Amino acid sequence: MAYKIRYRPTALAQLASIFDHITARNPTGARRVITAIKHRIDLLETFPHSAKESEIPGIREMPIVRYPYVVFYAVDDDAQEVWILRVRHTSQDPTHHLD
């Protein structure tokens, strides 16, 4: 059975911020980046444990291929849910304010 993808409000706000930031310079590029991020997140429905564990126990980090972003998420196997916690640029401190 597929896991349900759920987003923390912070993760949704970060996706919107990424889109807005890139759109200011390249609207087509912004759509490509967000599509790539969402495609990788969608894979977690089937493969929730595919990304490596982060330094923080219980949190995984999934790099976005071709783009400098990382998705941080947690898996709840009992509820069969994947919680998207943060979407960060790779230049940012990866563990700052993770919850």
Residue ranges of predicted features:
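Basic, Lys/Arg-enriched alpha-helical interface segments
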Residues: M1-I59, D77-D78, L85
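Enriched for short, Lys/Arg-rich terminal
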Residues: R31, V70, A74-D99
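Short acidic/glycine-enriched loop/turn segments that link adjacent beta-strands
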Residues: I56-G58, R66-Y69, S91
